[in-house]
Regions:
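Hydrophobic alpha-helical bundle cores within soluble ligand-binding/oligomerization subdomains
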Residues: 2-265
């Protein structure tokens, strides 16, 4: 009998079962072998709201709220918040390691070249009521992006998936800024890719009559840190919604719209 196992005695039958333990967990499918009779379906786990159920194995994010721990790919959040920018952290989450200089340059180039949205997206946002909630506008508009990029349905092609990552990382910020400007009754502002990712977001949000928006460096850095802190939150409701919807092989825009709806709750 292995030390890394759980011994279960079924008092209904008197039978004894050994269930392997791996990383502090057991597979609920291993409970299926616990039966009263051969035609019995087997024991199942019941866990309302999945409060004690892990849906997958992950090496991306570790959160321990009681101890104040947040790590992305093993890097402590304090280190990333002090020394990295948002696009570096996004690359880290996707690829497992921080980018070198050339990788960051290539990654940043691809993101900044996808910040613009189709002009018809403006008309779509214009259709919302003047006081519509920004999250409602974001959900609807991100979902609508799937109709602009039918190639996104080709989810089994690695290059196609990579292109959707570029698009979503870049365009969601533009859409969020448009939602804010719509509520404020202000004209939309085109992206300025000479600025940083967060500097450009501030530009699209707050530019007024100046020819060239120059973000306040303190505010720009504060927003950078805020984006880093919210880059990933482990297996929360919206993450599980994204994974569940994505498992049906739908395009990532539709899946992200559903995940945003879960976050909206």
């Amino acid at each position: 009998m292995s030390n890394e196992s759980l011994t279960i005695i079924d008092n209904r039958t008197g039978k004894q079962y050994e269930v392997p333990i791996s990383d502090g967990t057991i597979r609920t499918m291993d409970l299926r072998k616990i039966k009263v009779s051969d035609d019995d379906f087997g024991l199942m786990g019941y866990d309302p709201a999945f409060t004690n159920t892990a849906s997958c194995k992950s090496r991306i994010t570790l959160i321990d709220g009681d101890k104040g721990i947040l790590r992305y790919r093993g890097y402590p959040i304090e280190q990333l918040a002090e020394h990295s920018n948002y696009l570096e952290v996004a690359y880290l989450i996707l690829n497992g390691e921080l980018p070198n200089e050339e990788q960051l340059k290539d990654w940043t180039w691809h993101i900044t070249h996808h910040t613009f949205v189709h002009e018809n997206i403006k008309k779509f946002v214009d259709g919302f009521h003047y006081d519509a909630h920004p999250m409602g506008m974001l959900i609807g508009t991100v979902g609508a992006l799937s109709t602009f990029y039918p190639d996104a349905k080709n989810i089994f092609d690695a290059e196609s998936r990579k292109k959707q990552i570029y698009r979503l990382t870049a365009k969601v910020a533009t859409i969020a800024a448009y939602a804010y400007r719509h509520r404020m009754g202000l004209p939309y502002v085109y992206p300025d890719n000479d600025l940083s990712f967060t500097g450009n977001f501030l530009n699209m949000m707050f530019k007024t009559t100046e020819l060239k928006y120059q973000p306040n460096p303190i505010l720009e850095r504060a927003l950078e840190v805020l984006f880093i802190l919210h880059a990933d939150h482990e297996q929360n409701c919206s993450t599980n919604a994204m994974r569940g919807i994505g498992s049906s092989h739908v395009d990532p825009y539709s899946a992200l719209a559903g995940a945003a709806a879960a976050l909206y709750g």
